[in-house]
């Protein structure tokens, strides 16, 4: 999708579709929805829809007016953004996405009026100037670009009769306020982030026979060449050389070799510290190994590499946005398969750190590859770590399909990430990693075991990872419940969500 900015009068713009936002006026009869754009032409064109309550301004409600009087656009699309007091870039991103998905089967280009203020009445609860997290109109433009780009694709690539419906071009209409450079930069940033999230989604969507560890490494290397960062991909011999026994143990049952993907973004002039280490679980297909999963739903285990894909997508955006901070990306890719060579429950593996691990359940494999990945990122110089993984079904049970789980061992680092979350619009919820939980992963025959029993599974998995980060500030994202969109929603297709890409980018930018 191409995105442009324009300062033309929206009512005078000739376009297939013009998108205007509406604020929810409330439930009382006299609280009419307010169109975002201050225009007599829009007000007149939408008067009948407002009178008939086809437009209320409720979040994601969409009404269409064909051949609107006084407006040169062929159709006027009014999208609700909810109440003014709760309207942030989170709602705006959704609204832009919903408009794109509603239009993309019928038009190839559209325009949207960026919110500046609601104007008019004195009541700040209904007509307040929009207070976005990073300051007004630029944040709005960025959110529109992100939401529109992410909403555009559908994931039916392997239909033999596939028809592609995508919006080719979007114009964001902004006032001529003398801040053109800021708005252009915000638009480009949103476009890069949205495209990088879609890059991640493309990786996650591929079936296991078309996304092996080797292929994932090839895709990462190709991306790195395109954006100008270093990427090295290592396999079995390197894992043995580095004594990555935990990582190797997961891959040993598969005919497909593992891939350790190492990406480096090192801008000239960046300080030697901090160095951010992004570590992702890249299990390209997870049968569970000898502790095999039920057949029902196993096809979805192609997305068990969503954490690794998120790190690859984030590194793409980082390279293009060029923050002044060093970043290392480490993705541990493998298949978890049963065979005569596969690891067994009761085996003891030695991690790169030297810790011994009793294998209780071979389906608790993600934490094994991350254990070596986190330790290796530290060896490469990372001063701050963040990992992402579709790690536990327990996190899905606890938080459902709405929030990812967040764990952190450092309050300052977590607070920085919490601010990044607000800016990204991604939904995550912090869970505890108290030392009391450590008892649950103790083993009588090894330093630790790879599962902690029935209860608190997401927490005990995080406690396991904590054993491999030491005192390094670290954040763990358990994205198991939110990496895959089970059903389409107005602003997002069914399929991979690309979760964690935006928040990780915001975190990195906060350092540089």
Curated annotation (Swiss-Prot):
Binds 2 manganese ions per subunit. GO terms for cellular component: cytoplasm. Pfam families: Peptidase_M17, Peptidase_M17_N. Mn(2+) 2 binds at residues 281, 286, 304, 365. It comes from the Bacteria. Keywords: Aminopeptidase, Cytoplasm, Hydrolase, Manganese, Metal-binding, Protease. CDD domains: Peptidase_M17. Signal peptide: none annotated. The keyword Cytoplasm applies. One of its GO terms (biological process) is proteolysis. GO terms for molecular function: manganese ion binding; metalloaminopeptidase activity. Transmembrane segments: none annotated. It catalyses: Release of an N-terminal amino acid, Xaa-|-Yaa-, in which Xaa is preferably Leu, but may be other amino acids including Pro although not Arg or Lys, and Yaa may be Pro. Amino acid amides and methyl esters are also readily hydrolyzed, but rates on arylamides are exceedingly low; Release of an N-terminal amino acid, preferentially leucine, but not glutamic or aspartic acids. It is an enzyme of class 3 (hydrolase). Mn(2+) 1 binds at residues 286, 363, 365. Its cofactor is Mn(2+). The active site is at 293, 367. Its EC number is 3.4.11.1, 3.4.11.10. It is found in: Cytoplasm. Its main location: cytoplasm. PROSITE patterns: CYTOSOL_AP. Belongs to the peptidase M17 family. Presumably involved in the processing and regular turnover of intracellular proteins. Catalyzes the removal of unsubstituted N-terminal amino acids from various peptides. This is Probable cytosol aminopeptidase.
């Amino acid at each position: 999708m191409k995105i442009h900015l324009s300062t033309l009068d929206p009512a005078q713009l000739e376009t297939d579709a013009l998108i205007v936002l509406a604020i929810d006026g409330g439930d009382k009869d006299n609280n009419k929805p307010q169109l975002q754009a201050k225009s007599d032409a829009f007000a007149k064109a939408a008067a009948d829809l407002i009178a008939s309550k086809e437009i209320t301004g409720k979040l994601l409600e969409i009404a269409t007016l064909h051949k609107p009087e006084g407006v040169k656009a062929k159709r006027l699309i009014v999208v609700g953004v909810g109440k003014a007091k709760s309207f942030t870039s989170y709602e705006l991103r959704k609204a832009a996405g919903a408009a794109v998905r509603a239009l993309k089967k019928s038009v190839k280009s559209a325009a949207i009026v960026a919110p500046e203020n609601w104007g008019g009445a004195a009541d700040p609860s209904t007509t307040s100037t929009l207070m976005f997290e990073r300051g007004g109109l630029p944040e709005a433009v960025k959110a529109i670009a992100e939401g529109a780009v992410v909403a555009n694709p559908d994931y039916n690539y392997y239909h033999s009769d596939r028809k592609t419906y995508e919006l080719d071009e979007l114009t964001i209409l902004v006032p001529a306020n003398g801040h053109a450079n800021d708005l252009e930069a915000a638009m480009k940033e949103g476009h890069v982030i949205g495209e990088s999230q879609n890059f991640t989604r493309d990786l996650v969507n591929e079936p296991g026979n078309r996304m092996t560890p080797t292929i994932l490494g090839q895709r990462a290397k190709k991306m790195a060449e395109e954006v100008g960062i270093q990427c090295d991909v290592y396999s079995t011999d390197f894992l043995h050389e580095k004594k990555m026994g935990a990582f190797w143990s997961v891959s040993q049952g598969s005919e497909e070799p593992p891939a350790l993907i190492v990406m480096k973004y090192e801008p000239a002039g960046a300080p030697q510290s901090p160095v951010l280490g992004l570590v992702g679980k890249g299990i390209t297909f997870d049968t569970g190994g000898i502790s095999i999963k039920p057949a029902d739903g196993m096809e979805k285990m192609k997305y068990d590499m969503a954490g690794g894909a998120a790190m690859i997508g984030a590194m793409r955006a980082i390279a293009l946005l060029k923050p002044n901070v060093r970043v290392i990306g480490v993705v541990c890719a493998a298949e978890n398969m049963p065979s005569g060579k596969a690891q067994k429950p009761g085996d003891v593996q030695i991690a790169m750190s030297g810790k011994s691990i009793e294998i209780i359940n071979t389906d608790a494999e993600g934490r094994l590859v991350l254990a070596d990945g986190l330790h290796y990122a530290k060896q490469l110089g990372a001063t701050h770590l963040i990992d992402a993984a579709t790690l536990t079904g327990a996190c899905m049970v606890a938080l459902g399909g709405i929030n990812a789980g967040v764990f952190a061992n450092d309050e300052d680092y977590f607070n920085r990430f919490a601010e990044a979350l607000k800016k990204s619009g991604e939904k995550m919820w912090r869970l505890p990693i108290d030392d009391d939980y450590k008892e649950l992963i103790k083993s009588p025959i090894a330093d630790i075991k790879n599962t902690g029993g029935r209860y608190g599974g997401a927490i005990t998995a995080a406690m396991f990872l904590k054993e491999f980060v030491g005192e390094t500030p670290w954040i763990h994202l358990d994205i198991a419940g939110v990496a895959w969109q089970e059903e389409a929603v107005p602003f997002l297709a069914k399929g991979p969500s690309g979760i964690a890409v935006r928040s990780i980018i915001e975190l990195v930018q906060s350092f540089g």
